Amino acid sequence: MKIQIKTKEESRNAINRLGLNTVPEIFIEKHETDKMRQFMDTYKEELYVLRDADRSSSHYEYISSYEECVEKAKHFKGRVILAVSINTYKEKLLLGAIEIKGDVVRLCATENKALDHRTMYGGAEYNFETDIFDKNLSKIPELDFLYGYIVEHQLFDITVEFTIYDKCVGTKNERIIINEIRNY
């Protein structure tokens, strides 16, 4: 499957179109406080994340209340993404990004619960490129589960940013969250 993704919104739309499991989130204008309240009333969690909807690797804020959301949103320039934070779900087993292109596997992943998708690149235990026949891949916890998910959903030739948990979570109530798919 050849998917072209240039933005976070295109990634989110593709994730939804492909029926992948993700966290609840909305793309809104920073002044749409009624939509913020409705989202937080619908998805009552301990922790949310607010981030720029139009720029990757941009500033983000963790928030825990509607009032805090409204206040922090004022500091963003335009559209924002309000999402349930993946940190709400406890017991991450493996977090990372993987791309399988032909026989080539590119993987950056960690079991370190202190790392996230932005900080893992500097401290991930698994950060390499190899082929799918490399026997060392079988030593990585949950990689068989991840590979099965990629095959089931035909997520080849694209980077898949994921988090795997010890229990079912997210919009589809599965053990894996797909945080982003990208080729930008």
Give names to the regions the model predicted:
Residues M1-Y184:
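Nucleotide/phosphate-binding sheet-loop regions of phosphoryl- and nucleotidyl-transfer enzymes
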